[in-house]
Amino acid sequence: MKRQTALSCAAVLFTVTAVAHGAGEPTPAERAVGYRQSVFHVIAGNFGPMAGMAKGEIPFDAKAFALRAERVAFLSTLPLEGFIPDSRVGKTEAKAEIWDNMDDFKAKMETFQTEAGKLAEAAKTASAIDALKPQFGKVGQACK
């Protein structure tokens, strides 16, 4: 019985390995697209609940807001790594203007980082959402 189990496991492992190799390795550009999409997905996952609090759709929780603001501030430093040359491939929502004017895009990303950092700092001591709404709005505008 142990031998049959071992053979079955070996067959499954061989099949999985063969399928994985058949799919081919992603190119650096494809990896960059996946990376930046993942980062933006995590940013959105943290930004969404803060937006819900700002809109009054969910109750304000100062600790949760501060945690999410801190995460967004950190995450805002990551996306640029995913915008490498020739990474305008596959399914991506990245606008063509990014590559047409990379310096402008980098400046906008720096603004996003700055505004997200200010929000994280303000959220550390805020006890009401109204105190955070103006800075939250600036982060949202910088993210467009």
What are these regions (language model features)?
Residues P26, E30-A62, R68-K144:
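Sequence context surrounding c-type heme c attachment/ligation sites in exported
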Residues M1-C9:
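Bacterial N-terminal signal peptides that target proteins for export
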Residues T15-V19:
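N-terminal signal peptide c-region/cleavage motif recognized by signal peptidases
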Residues A11-L13:
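Repetitive helical segments and hydrophobic/amphipathic motifs
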Residues A20-G24:
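Boundary at the C-terminal end of the N-terminal hydrophobic targeting segment
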